[in-house]
From Swiss-Prot:
One of its GO terms (molecular function) is L-lactate dehydrogenase activity. GO terms for biological process: lactate metabolic process; tricarboxylic acid cycle. Gene3D superfamilies: Lactate dehydrogenase/glycoside hydrolase, family 4, C-terminal, NAD(P)-binding Rossmann-like Domain. This is Malate dehydrogenase. NAD(+) binds at residues 7-12, 32, 94, 117-119. The keyword Acetylation does not apply. Keywords: NAD, Oxidoreductase, Tricarboxylic acid cycle. Belongs to the LDH/MDH superfamily. MDH type 3 family. It is an enzyme of class 1 (oxidoreductase). Substrate binds at residues 81, 87, 119, 150. It comes from the Bacteria. It comes from Chlorobium limicola (strain DSM 245 / NBRC 103803 / 6330). NCBIfam families: MalateDH_bact, PRK06223.1.
Amino acid sequence: MKITVIGAGNVGATASLRIAEKQLAKEVVLIDIVEGIPQGKALDMYESGPVALFDTCIYGSNDYKDSENSDIVLITAGLARKPGMTREDLLMKNTAIIKEVTEQVMRYSKNPIIIMVSNPLDVMTYVAHTISGLAKERVIGMAGVLDTARFRSFIAEELNVSMQDINAFVLGGHGDSMVPIVKYTSIAGIPITELLPKEKIDAIVERTRNGGIEIVNHLKTGSAYYAPAASAVEMIEAIVKDRKRILPCTTMLNGQFGIDGVFCGVPVKLGKNGIEQILEINLSEYELEALQKSAALVEENCNSLQAVLS
């Protein structure tokens, strides 16, 4: 198993180390355009092997040729939004980056599974799918796993229970339009509505929507990377081990939930072939409407890129 991670920033480097520590691949390649950064970080990780007890070969490179014949490619490259930069500016700049990255990936790997982490997540997943020509089941966005992890952690904190006992789904887009599904949220099988009043649940939902911003406000410079990296690696592990995990991931819908031809976060079954099934669960009228509104925002942004991608 060969896994390539594009982008040697905090998310990419942290994910690379977790992949190695879990021994999910024989070979991990960390690629970045900045000379020396991927090489230095990868060497540092590799030298931790005897202590962390892994034998994975990790190396860094500035050359996409080193990604040749990758089974899985994790894309974390892209710019963060800077002061004075509009969302449209960020969208266009990162579209150009992801277009170039995807072209290079496909130049050297015939049929990889691509996992997208770069923002705006849902749109960048669409870009990678459009440019790669891969089957939609093999281009997957990491959003719902992270948003769900935040939702679960906040519930566990409020109830003072183990995070492992929290079951939940956060669907829709990665951002203000995400849709935490309270109906399917439970604690060791007990519906959350039996343990928390509506106002507490609503507050947790709102905190989840602002989870990324909360971290940015603390850090002042930079953004979250431990939880995003862990979420991406959970997806990779499900694929590598063919675990058939049911996880909320961004995928292209073809009529499910009344959404067609748009990438949106929904429950899927993840296995060795990528997305093996989309689970069209029953949603309340409000939840379905919120999910469709979220998808409409993604579609609007994708439509604005047609000239760039053609």
